[in-house]
A protein has these predicted regions:
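Trp/Phe/Arg-rich N-terminal binding region typifying the photolyase-homology
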Residues: 1-140
């Protein structure tokens, strides 16, 4: 019997299960889903109060995902390295995430997507933070 390869859903600023296109797509694929939140340099740059709120939000989010039989893995380090290690550990087929639009995140996410695809893995980003992606809006 062959084991289905899971899809990793990388959560960042989008700790929710409703109206989450990346999570919906992963669940619709019919394979196991693994959720991950990575404490990286961007999270490290937060002040004490936002870090406290994030910790509390992650506690609640872990319980919410558990009710859906989706484990939430918490890791620390550079996102690309953490995702590579998690893919190796879980034999995942790919990673899905919601797009972020600030320059540092765009640069990081573009590099991660290229790296994953170069390894033959699925790397999909989804809208989810804005009503429209910035490049789709035009003035008349």
């Amino acid at each position: 019997m062959s084991k289905e390869k899971p899809i990793i859903v990388w959560f960042r600023r989008d700790l929710r299960v409703s109206d989450h296109p990346a999570l919906s797509a992963a669940c619709a694929a019919g394979v196991p889903v693994i959720a991950v939140f990575i404490k990286d340099d961007i999270v490290d740059g937060l002040g004490a109060a936002p870090k406290w709120r994030l910790g509390k939000a992650l506690e609640v989010f872990t319980q919410t995902l558990a009710r859906l039989n989706i484990p939430l893995i918490l890791r620390e380090g550079p996102a690309g390295d953490v995702l590579d290690a998690l893919i190796t550990e879980t034999d995942a087929q790919g990673v899905y995430w919601s797009r972020l639009y600030d320059p540092a995140c765009v640069t990081r996410d573009t590099a991660i997507k290229a790296d994953l695809r170069s390894k033959g893995l699925e790397a999909r980003s989804f809208g989810g933070h804005l009503m429209f992606d910035p490049w789709t809006v035009e003035t008349k």
